[in-house]
């Protein structure tokens, strides 16, 4: 029978529940378990697709085109699995589904209520995740903080599941904070005690408490937490702040988190083989080189908006024994006169995806500077469109060339709306989303990176390169190294007379893994390392 683990959080948000859930998933997978994982978000939006990155951070896209929470990126990178649309559930999705059923008459005239209709729908989403993947274990992270009014239906639903399927098939892990009070020079357990009290008042007794802390906590403190929260002392797991996220699974394993889970759920687990993961952590701690990559974007104040890009750069760095430092550059502040100063000491420039006109001209200047000064350049999604516009303006001499998204009246719409998007009115869930094939042209940097003729990458865009300008661009040294199999959609562009200048319409950052870097990121960092060594 499938087992279900629920990860909740208390005291404050942003405790790292997602990292704990992902780490546990990795540990159980290495014990031979088939694992899937999902995130429940209590907000009323149907998905984060139309939310500002300042509100939510990155929107992570799955193979099947779901726009999801950034925690799914952590899940995929840690556990090395591909998730799907069942892996992210929001209040908006739940209420939408229930209301559709009510309109169809599925409830036979009954009064639709939070209990049982909303809670039943929530439980169904948990069970469905297991059925769709045939997983041994389903891990579900409950977003928000215990005590939030938005989370109450979610907590009630997972409370009911213990009675529905038996206590040995359900486990609750609660993440809390033990803050350090600098003036007193003490760690305090009281917030944890109150958070668990709140959770227990809702009918949920945690089996394990994971304590986030700035510094090691004493055994006496663990004993105190165990006493007041009515759990075994061994079930109080310390999660100290870490410089390297990938060391956390090893930290949790050392304290027996995965063994506690296996014992409680009566799982027949083999001994975990963490050799590859230990080698990764050792490598990360002993990188011998350092390079700097300038990231030119519009959301740089909130670095979570680019979290998969940053992690992908780091993964690629590991392959070259290089620590990748990010120089965050606000595209709105970039001008022709300061671009050299802003990117000083840079070994490579990356322009990631985005929407809207803010900062676009700064990104175009960055692409031009990288092209003219032979600095390795990588453009992603909007970054590819930016590179195309810059080349059209400054090499082909098409003054005023732009994207129809940014300037609908441009005389040269190098980037235009996808034909199937012309009659679309709703913004949410209507982009070109998910996994699509890309056919590569031989004797190009893209083909060299992938060493394959056809590759599959995840997309999230509404605009595309305008084929009316393809021949003109090709005749002037612009290389279309990747297209859709029918040749209609441009997927990858690059320059011949440049050490490494490549841009893609898709989002390669969504498929990178710490032990298996994404090919384009790997070659970009390889070129940047080479550039650094030649200085």
From Swiss-Prot:
L-glutamine binds at residues 54, 354, 382-385, 405, 462. Catalyzes the ATP-dependent amination of UTP to CTP with either L-glutamine or ammonia as the source of nitrogen. Regulates intracellular CTP levels through interactions with the four ribonucleotide triphosphates. HAMAP family: PyrG. It comes from Bacillus velezensis (strain DSM 23117 / BGSC 10A6 / LMG 26770 / FZB42). Keywords: ATP-binding, Glutamine amidotransferase, Ligase, Magnesium, Metal-binding, Nucleotide-binding, Pyrimidine biosynthesis. Pfam families: CTP_synth_N, GATase. It is an enzyme of class 6 (ligase). Its EC number is 6.3.4.2. GO terms for molecular function: ATP binding; CTP synthase activity; glutaminase activity; identical protein binding; metal ion binding. UTP binds at residues 13, 188-193, 224. GO terms for biological process: 'de novo' CTP biosynthetic process; pyrimidine nucleobase biosynthetic process. Mg(2+) binds at residues 71, 141. Residues 292-534 form the Glutamine amidotransferase type-1 domain. CTP binds at residues 13, 148-150, 188-193, 224. The active site is at residues 381, 507, 509. NCBIfam families: PRK05380.1 (NF003792), PyrG (TIGR00337). Homotetramer. Residues 1-267 are annotated as: Amidoligase domain. Allosterically activated by GTP, when glutamine is the substrate; GTP has no effect on the reaction when ammonia is the substrate. The allosteric effector GTP functions by stabilizing the protein conformation that binds the tetrahedral intermediate(s) formed during glutamine hydrolysis. Inhibited by the product CTP, via allosteric rather than competitive inhibition. CTPSs have evolved a hybrid strategy for distinguishing between UTP and CTP. The overlapping regions of the product feedback inhibitory and substrate sites recognize a common feature in both compounds, the triphosphate moiety. To differentiate isosteric substrate and product pyrimidine rings, an additional pocket far from the expected kinase/ligase catalytic site, specifically recognizes the cytosine and ribose portions of the product inhibitor. ATP binds at residues 14-19, 71. Pathway: Pyrimidine metabolism; CTP biosynthesis via de novo pathway; CTP from UDP: step 2/2. This is CTP synthase.
């Amino acid at each position: 029978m499938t087992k279900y683990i629920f990860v909740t959080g208390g005291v404050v948000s942003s405790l790292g529940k997602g990292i704990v859930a992902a780490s546990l998933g990795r540990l159980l997978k290495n014990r031979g378990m088939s694992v899937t994982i999902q995130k429940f978000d209590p907000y009323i939006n149907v998905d984060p697709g139309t939310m500002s990155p300042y509100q939510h951070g990155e929107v992570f896209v799955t193979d099947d085109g779901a726009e999801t929470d950034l925690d799914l990126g952590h899940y995929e990178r840690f556990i090395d699995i591909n998730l799907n649309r069942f892996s992210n559930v929001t209040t908006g999705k739940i209420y939408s589904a229930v209301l559709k059923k009510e309109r169809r008459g599925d409830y036979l005239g009954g009064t639709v209520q939070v209990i049982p209709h909303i809670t039943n729908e929530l439980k169904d989403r948990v069970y469905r995740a297991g059925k769709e993947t045939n997983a041994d274990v389903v891990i579900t992270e409950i977003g928000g903080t215990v005590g939030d009014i938005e989370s109450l239906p979610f907590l009630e639903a997972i409370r009911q599941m213990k009675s529905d399927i038996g206590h040995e098939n359900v486990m609750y892990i609660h993440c809390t904070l033990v803050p350090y009070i600098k003036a007193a020079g003490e760690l305090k357990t009281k917030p944890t005690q109150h958070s668990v009290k709140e959770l227990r008042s809702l009918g949920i007794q945690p089996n394990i408490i994971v304590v986030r802390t700035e510094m090691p906590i004493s055994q006496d403190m663990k004993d105190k937490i165990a006493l007041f929260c009515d759990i075994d002392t061994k079930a109080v797991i310390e999660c100290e702040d870490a410089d390297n996220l990938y060391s956390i699974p090893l930290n949790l394993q050392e304290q027996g988190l995965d063994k506690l889970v296996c014992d409680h759920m009566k799982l027949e687990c083999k001994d975990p083989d963490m050799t590859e993961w230990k080698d990764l952590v050792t490598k990360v701690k002993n990188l011998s080189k350092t390079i700097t990559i300038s990231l030119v974007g519009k959301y740089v104040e909130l670095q979570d908006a680019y979290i998969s890009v940053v992690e992908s750069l780091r993964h690629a760095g590991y392959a070259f024994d290089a620590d990748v430092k990010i120089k965050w550059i606000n595209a709105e502040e970039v001008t022709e006169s300061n671009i050299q100063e802003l990117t000083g000491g840079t070994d490579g420039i990356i322009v990631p995806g985005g929407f809207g006109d803010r900062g676009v001209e700064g990104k175009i200047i960055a692409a031009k500077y990288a092209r003219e000064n032979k600095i390795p350049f990588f453009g992603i999604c909007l970054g590819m469109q930016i590179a195309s516009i810059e080349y059209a303006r400054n090499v082909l001499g098409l003054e005023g060339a732009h994207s129809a998204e940014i300037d609908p009246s441009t005389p040269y719409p190098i980037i235009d709306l996808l034909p199937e998007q012309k009659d679309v009115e709703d913004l949410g869930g209507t982009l070109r989303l998910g996994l699509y094939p890309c056919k590569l042209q031989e004797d190009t940097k893209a083909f060299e990176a992938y060493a394959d003729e056809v590759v599959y990458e995840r997309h999230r865009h509404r605009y595309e390169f305008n084929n009316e300008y393809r021949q003109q661009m090709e005749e002037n040294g612009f290389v279309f190294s990747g297209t859709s199999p029918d040749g209609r959609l441009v997927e990858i562009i690059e320059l011949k007379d440049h050490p490494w200048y490549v841009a893609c319409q898709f989002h390669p950052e969504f498929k990178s893994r710490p032990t298996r870097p994404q090919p384009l990121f790997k070659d970009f960092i390889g070129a940047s390392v080479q550039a650094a060594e030649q200085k």
